[in-house]
């Protein structure tokens, strides 16, 4: 009985010892793993810190570089703006000078044109006045000549008309006397001696060369 208890106690002790040993091993393994994990975490943290520090330094360096580049670009932009402003001012001054010169030239040309127009107007007025005077004088002379010609034509026409009428009257009278003489002669040829004697007498009232008869 006692031996069974002893054996049971022995087995229990072995089991306990094995359990403790196993527990110890497990605890050792766990501790080792914990240390390894701790070391790993520490290394990771160190690496992270290193990377963070490196990143911080890199960021800081990058910031400095960016700042310097920005400052440099700002200076370049300022210089470019200053140059552009100077060129614009020079160009503006040049344009203003050219515009002023053109304005002066246009003013001078306008003055010359106005003076030339005034001179031409005066010359034209003088020529027009002279032409009008000459034209008026010529018209006056032509009118006087036409009036004189009309007067002379009227006088000549009057004289010619009078001569024609006088000549026609003389011709009519001559014809009438001739007809009368012919009738008288005819009657004398067919009448008695008395009439013949009377016919032998000059009973004509026409006198040659006078162109008229008389009583």
Swiss-Prot record:
It is found in: Nucleus. Residues 13-24, 32-41, 54-81, 88-111 have a biased composition (Basic and acidic residues). Keywords: Nucleus. Induction: Induced by chilling and mannitol. Induced by drought stress. Induced by salt stress. Induced by abscisic acid (ABA). Induced by D-allose and D-glucose. Its main location: nucleus. Expressed in the shoot apex and leaves. Expressed in dry seeds. Expressed in roots and leaves. The keyword tRNA processing does not apply. GO terms for cellular component: nucleus. Residues 1-129, 190-215 are annotated as: Disordered. The keyword Nucleus applies. Residues 192-215 have a biased composition (Polar residues). Belongs to the LEA type 4 family. This is Late embryogenesis abundant protein 14. It comes from Oryza sativa subsp. japonica. The lineage of its organism: Eukaryota, Viridiplantae, Streptophyta, Embryophyta, Tracheophyta.
């Amino acid at each position: 009985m006692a031996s069974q208890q002893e054996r049971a106690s022995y087995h229990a002790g072995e089991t306990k010892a094995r359990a403790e040993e196993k527990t110890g091993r497990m605890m050792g393994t766990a501790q080792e793993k914990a240390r390894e994990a701790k070391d790993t975490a520490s290394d990771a943290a160190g690496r992270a810190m290193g990377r963070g520090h490196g990143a911080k330094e890199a960021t800081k360096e990058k910031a400095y570089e960016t700042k310097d580049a920005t400052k440099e670009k700002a200076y370049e932009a300022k210089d470019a703006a200053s140059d552009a402003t100077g060129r614009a001012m020079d160009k503006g001054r040049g344009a203003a000078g050219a515009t002023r010169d053109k304005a002066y030239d246009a003013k001078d040309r306008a003055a010359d044109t106005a003076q030339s127009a005034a001179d031409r107007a005066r010359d034209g007025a003088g020529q027009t006045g002279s032409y009008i005077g000459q034209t008026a004088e010529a018209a006056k002379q032509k009118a006087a000549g036409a009036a004189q010609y009309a007067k002379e034509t009227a006088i000549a026409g009057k004289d010619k008309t009078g001569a024609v009428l006088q000549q026609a009257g003389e011709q009519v009278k001559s014809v009438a006397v001739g007809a009368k003489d012919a009738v008288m002669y005819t009657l004398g040829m067919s009448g008695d001696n008395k009439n013949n004697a009377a016919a032998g007498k000059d009973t004509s009232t026409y006198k040659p060369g006078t162109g008229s008869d008389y009583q």
